[in-house]
Every structure is written in C-alpha cells, then in structure tokens.
Amino acid sequence: MSKAAQVKAPWLNSRDPGVPATLTYSELSMCGRVEEMVRRYPDYIAYEFMGKCTTYADMWKKINACAKSLKAIGIREGDKVTICMPNAPQTLCMFYAVNMVGAIANMVHPLSAESEIAFYLRDSGSVAAITLDQFYPKFESVRKAVDLPCLIVTSVADELKPLLKVGYKLTKGRKNPKIPAGRAGVLSWKEFLRRGEYVEIYQVRRKAEDPAAILYSGGTTGVTKGILLSNRNFNALAAQIIATNPFFRPGHKMLAIMPMFHGFGLGVSIHSMVANGGHCILIPRFTPQSYAELIKKHQPNLIAGVPSLFEALLRVKEIEGADLSCLLGVFSGGDSLSVELKKRFDAFLKEHGASITVREGYGTTECVTASCLTPIHKQKEGSIGIPFPDTYYKIVKPGTQEEVPYGEEGEICLTGPTMMLEYVNHPEETAQTKQTHADGLTWVHTGDLGMMDEEGFIYFRQRIKRMIVTNGYNVYPSQLENILDGHEYVHLSCVIGVKDPIKMQRVKAFVVLKPGYVPTEACKQELMDYCRKHIAKYAMPSDIEFREELPKTLVGKVAYRVLEEEENAKLDAKAAENAKIDAQRRQLEEERKAAVQERKAKKAAEAKEAKEAKEAAKEAAKEAETPKE
C-alpha cells in the first residue's frame, strides 16, 4: 500500500462524475508537453493578442526562434532568465523558449520598483532579462548596481498587426523611452531574434523533476522569497485542471487576465491551456471596462480571476446586455471570495444567460497555484472545495504535525505532485514549510487557518498571522467581512486589527458603499447596529471607516497590510505627537518648577536681606543707645 493510500480522503465520494482519484502525469518538460499539442493541433489557435491570432504551429516557430537566440547570447542549461513582462506574446514565447534550452524562468511583475527588481535579479542570479521599453529606465538604473550581462527590450508594437502598430507608435508608443542604439548589453527584440537566425535548433531534453521557474511570494512567513518549481509541478497542475473540468475540449477559449508572473495566471490561464490545446486570449492590462468589452467581444468559455475582478465587473455598464451563455467555467482564487459576493456574481451570471456558478478554489504558490476546487455538482456555502486528484489535505494543530478532528480549525497542510522544490536561498524556511510527517509523506504547512468537514470539503478561514487577538479572544477578519458584505449598503469591506494598549488589538472595518449610498454618521450607525445583531460582542468593530475604494495588491487582492500600515502610521504619529506634547508639558512643568524655585530663592534672599538689614538696624540702634565714655 502506498503512503498516500493511508491518508484519510473523505472527499473522494464528493468528486464530480468522471473525475478520477489519480492521474498519469507527463514525464516531459513543460516545453515538451506543449510540443505534443503542436503535433496534435497545429492549426488550432494557441493565443490571441490585440486581435492577432497565432496557431500552435506558428507559436512553435516563435518559441524555436527565441530558443536559438537564447543560445546565441550564451544562455545555457540551468541559467536564470528574468521575464519582467505583462501578458503578451513575447512573454509566452520567451517563457517556453527558456524552458526549451534548459534554463529557468524568473517571473517578475513589470510594475516592481527598482529596488525590488534589483532584489529579484540578485536573488535568482539572473544572467539575462527581458522587459518592455516603457520599463527600460528602471532596468538601466538597476544594471549599474547589478551584474546583468544581457537585457532584451521589446515593445507592445512588436507583436501588433501592421495598422495597429502604426496607431500604437503614433499614440501610446510615443511616450515610451527610446532605447539607445549600440548600448552594451542591451538588445532590441528585433536584434535579439536576428542573433539566432543562423543558429541550429537548440533544445535541451529536461526531465520532469528539473527546475523550470521561479515565482515570488510572501510564502508562509510573509517575507518575499523565490519559489522554485519544476516541470512536473506545472504539467501535473495542467492535468489536474483538465481532469476537474471534464467539459473542457481543445480549442476552448480562456480569457487570460491573470498575469504570467503569478502562479494563477501562469499555471491556470496559460500552461493548463497550451498544454491541452486551449486558446489563450492574452490581456496585458486590466481595467473593468475593457475586461467587460473583451468578454462581450470574444465570448470566452473560461475566465479565472481574483474576487476583486468579479466585484469590478458588477459595477461597469459595459457588461450590460452581455450574453454569457458561452461560459463553461468561472473560477475564483488568489483571495477569499465572500459568500455575499459569490451570491451576487452567481445571480449576475444567471441574469446574463450563463448556466453555471462561480467555482472557488484555493492554493498557494508553494504548489504553483490551485490545489483544491469546488466540484460542479456539489457546492457548500463558504467552502473552497475538495482537493485535486493525487493531492491530499489535512488540518493540523498550529505549530505541530498533529491532525485535528473533522470540523475543528487548524493549519491547512497539503501534499501532491505540484509541491515546490524549495525556497530559493532559504533552506531553513524550506525545512519549516516542507515537513515530513509520521505517515512518511512530505507536507506543505501553508500558514493558513482552515477546517475540513466529514465529506472532505475544505473551508479557508484566513492567514494564521492575520488573526486578530482582542481581550484574549480570536477574531477572524474574513468572517466579519462576510457579515459586512451581506448588508445591502456594502459593496466591499476589509477588517483589520489595530494595536491597542489594553485589548492588545481592537477591530476596525473599512467599507466601500454601493453606488447611491452616502457615507454619513447615520449610515455608520446602521452598519454598527447590523454588526451588533450578527457579531459577538468581543468581535465588534470599534470603528467603521468609509473609503471610495480599498487598496489592492499588484494582482488585485485587497491589500489589508496597507490598511494595517496606515493605521500603525497613524498610531505612531499620534504617539509621536503625544510624546511631543508630553515633552512640552514636562518642559513647562520644569520651567514652572524652576520659576517657583527662583521665586522662592528670590523671596528667601529678600527675606534674608531684610532680616540682615533689620539686624543691622538693631545693632546700629543698640550702638547708638550705648553711652559714650
């Protein structure tokens, strides 16, 4: 009996019909798996960008051209190449070309600050990088401090249709910085491809277990780290995604809005599609209006995104009248989907002709992305679903490997074929996160709080470190957010803990109201009264602050840490102001005391002087009364 067979798996009876408990996984590299699709579906559309479609056969030619050029500039097996790009053809082709030559793709957000880019380049040990012309100044500045032998600079225009290219160069492209010709170590996209024209086709046959990509995440400790993932990790995910969506057919369209530097975007929206004959519609930049228009125009079969993406769609008029009967799968992940938002978006889908509901998933970058998904035919309110085939979950007492009973909260642990190789340059954190349990399996300790019911459905609560402790009670922000989001006034909410000298932390809520509602004291009182009816006294918000919008992370999650930092900054400023006032008070008190002392001293001196004068007068009088001989 295998080790995995000994693990409790109550979810097996909750699988959709046709979804197997175990799968057979490709032993090829990621690129090798894509090559299989090229042979099977050469004339199918692999990706589409700004109205320009590229078949699998043509995509393969582009990947080969990139691979030859990578060889020409000296990239070899095991080298790291940073890809700092939005979703664009160059990003996709370069990613698979890097894989083809046996190198490792280091995926970085193009809006990263200079200091962050420098960190990513140093941390990964990258020997080359590719970015857009509009981000060139950041890299040029960084190159002075970081040893980066080669920088490839491309433009959106490089992959546009001729007319669109002209239009782009006359409008948005005019604002982009010009790349100096002949700059040492800097190549334009055209020059980069020219370098490989006379190089033989170059492909390194890598194994499934070989490293393929580095994705950055806060990890289970909250500190940014590179997560090293293998070919098997990505290929296993692609197989699991298709297995849990048995309706999928080659040629189905995925609107790829999630970025390729994120596990959700790279693993689900891109690789799971091109590794199975899917059609990716590449979206380089998100706005609610353009996203709504793209859905109406392209009629995708699949969309995947974070909750804020779905929340944004509910607010834009551009989606009105859209026929969404084309949708076969809508997936939410990357952040907690509130019960209320799911209800609203499910109703929205139904109103627009879709016969499906949002399926929530859960995952961590330590396992590429999703490892758990709500089944099609059985959903439970508040649940993030059941584990993928060959993936196992258990809930343990935090800080231990001790499994807790069904229905009891603890730390979510998981194991399966998508589990990372390691944290780059962080062996201690790797050992803390990947732990071998008594069952002999290696488990990822996620740092997330959750629960499993008797049917194997998983319920995510929140990050363990996000838990608020007030007066000794544990308060879970996500639960309070679910309650607040259920009020008819509330569009979106975020709950945080604020430092308190007596309670340790107090609860504060931030609320974005729905259109038509005004943030008045009466409105705040209505929400506070609502909270009193639905929230335990110890968990009640001490304050509700209205915002027009909430801060978001680079991938669209609500950035609760930004709100925490803002509140901490206010407290620090208040503490500094109080300290200043206290110092002023102390100074005034010292000055008052000094003045009192001075007055006392002066009075004493005057009294002494008066006494001495009086005594002198007495002596003089006495002397005057004494008869002279």
Task: Identify the role of each PLM range.
Residues 386-390, 402-435, 475, 570-572:
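Conserved ATP/PPi-binding loop(s) of AMP-dependent carboxylate-activating enzymes
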Residues 112, 129-131, 303, 416, ...:
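AMP-binding/adenylate-forming catalytic core of the ANL superfamily
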Residues 70-75, 196-210, 214-256, 278, ...:
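Conserved adenylate-forming
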Residues 12, 141-208:
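ANL superfamily adenylate-forming
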